[in-house]
UniProtKB/Swiss-Prot annotation:
Function: NQR complex catalyzes the reduction of ubiquinone-1 to ubiquinol by two successive reactions, coupled with the transport of Na(+) ions from the cytoplasm to the periplasm. NqrA to NqrE are probably involved in the second step, the conversion of ubisemiquinone to ubiquinol.
Nucleus is among the record's keywords: no
Name of the protein in its database record: Na(+)-translocating NADH-quinone reductase subunit A
GO MF annotations, alphabetized: oxidoreductase activity, acting on NAD(P)H, quinone or similar compound as acceptor
Enzyme category, top tier: translocase
Organism: Neisseria gonorrhoeae (strain NCCP11945)
């Protein structure tokens, strides 16, 4: 087992009950274009057109052959675009049960599939988009070969679902999905799970299981990659989430695209935090209707540390998100708040009384408790960064955009989620995720 000591389990109230309930009926789903790094769509549909589940909606111009398929049948209700006509979302008004069927195999045949058969079915169904590269976190080219594939079967994000609860319901599909992935490449398939977690596996020669323990970010793919198969400019691995592995297992046996998702609905602003069964791209405002405390709330698709605000054209469950988090907007001001002992506020430093209340769960809001200021290296980054890098120096390079030094310090190993804790504990109130993405884009273009 690999156990990390540095990190932080955010003591946030509103943790979900680890029992799966059926979610409300969803009448709108969407694909969010901005989730896919570097993607430029070539649209295959238009507004008002009827589509089947599994039908191609658009293709990536920059990555030919990579197609994005409809998560449900219905009519194209809207195609939202932002500045410079960047695709924000393709919205489908759900109607009927029409779907496209893909190749299917008897379970006994999965162990004999060729790499070409696996690749073809994943690409045609749109499940190829479940794979992401590291470095750069992009969808891999259709003819690319990874050094390894990392299956993330654990989650240490605040208010997250326990993957073992979800995998237990679909154990056979999960095992079949692993078997299919083992036929995609001869390289290692690394299945990463929490210490002692009951996660099934397959006996294929190239499948290895690893256990990780310790605080967040022990459950992030970036942590797993760093300790097992570090990447670099000339070494690429792929990552995939456990729910997508289940979907792959079902696709190859049934020939039908499975877009079911189990998400954690959590936060103190939720009346009954729990796990909900829904669909990929579900409209978040429909999922949370009647579920929230009547207040000024911020609804987030994903983790409170690294999720996206779910509203307007982005009011849909993200492709790579397994939770919906709800916290109160922190718009109010406190008179002499910095002088008070503040037992109800958490701090990683000793600036509040809440720091010393080790077993207390706190009500977090969106307030950042201060304005923008200079980056202050007081050791907080080192306390939450378990990777063998120098976080203060790396973060400084991200701020000034020094790509050469950032590469030397290990930025190619990282994704936005890997720096979310650094943003949380930063005295200077910097958001390091967007800074990292800007540097990675520059490196990819200019080297």
């Amino acid at each position: 087992m690999i156990k990390i000591k540095k990190g932080l389990n955010l003591p946030i109230a509103g943790r979900p009950e680890q029992v799966i309930y059926d979610g409300p009926a969803i009448t709108e789903v969407a694909l969010l274009g901005e989730e896919y790094v570097g993607m430029r769509p070539s649209m295959k549909i238009k507004e008002g057109e009827a589509v089947k589940k599994g039908q191609v909606l658009f293709e990536d111009k920059k990555n030919p052959g990579v197609v994005f398929t409809a998560p449900a049948s219905g009519k194209i209700a809207a195609i939202h675009r932002g500045e410079k006509r960047v695709l924000q979302s393709v919205v489908i008004a759900v109607e009927g049960n029409d779907e496209i069927e893909f190749e299917r195999y008897v379970p006994e045949a999965l162990a004999k599939l060729s790499s070409e058969e696996v690749r073809r079915n994943l690409i045609q169904s749109g499940l190829w988009t479940a794979l992401r590269t590291r470095p750069f976190s992009k969808i891999p080219a259709v003819d690319a070969e990874p050094f390894a594939i990392f299956v993330n079967a654990m989650d240490t994000n605040p208010l997250a679902a326990d993957p073992t609860v979800i995998i237990k319901e679909a154990a056979e599909d999960f095992k079949r999905g692993l078997l299919v992935l083992s036929r995609l490449t001869e390289r290692k398939i690394h299945v990463c799970k929490a210490a002692g977690a009951d996660v099934p596996s397959e006996n294929a020669a190239n499948i290895e299981t690893h256990e990780f323990g310790g605080p967040h970010p022990a459950g992030l793919s970036g942590t797993h990659i760093h300790f097992i198969e570090p990447v670099g400019a000339n070494k690429t691995v792929w990552t995939i989430n456990y729910q997508d592995v289940i979907a792959i297992g079902r696709l190859f046996v049934t020939g039908r695209l499975n877009t079911e998702r189990v998400v954690a609905l959590g936060g103190l602003q939720v009346n009954k935090p729990r796990l909900l069964r829904t669909v990929l791209g579900a409209k978040v405002s429909q999922l949370t209707a009647g579920e929230l405390v009547d207040a000024d709330n911020r609804v987030i698709s994903g983790s409170v540390l690294n999720g996206a605000i779910a509203q307007g054209a982005h009011d849909y469950l993200g492709r790579y998100h397994n939770q919906i988090s709800v916290i109160e907007e922190g718009r109010g001001k406190e008179l002499f708040g910095w002088v008070a002992p503040q037992p109800d506020k958490y701090s990683i430093t000793r600036t509040t009384l809440g720091h010393f209340l080790k077993n207390k769960l706190f009500k977090f809001t969106t307030a950042v408790n201060g304005g923008d200021r200079a980056m202050v290296p007081i050791g907080t980054y080192e306390r939450v960064m378990p990777l063998d890098i120098l976080p203060t120096l790396l973060l400084r390079d991200l701020i000034v955009g020094d790509t050469d030094s950032a590469q030397a310090l290990g930025c190619l190993e990282l994704d936005e989620e890997d720096l979310a804790l650094c943003s949380f504990v930063c005295p200077g109130k910097y958001e390091y995720g967007p800074l990292l993405r800007k540097v990675l884009e520059t490196i990819e273009k200019e080297g």
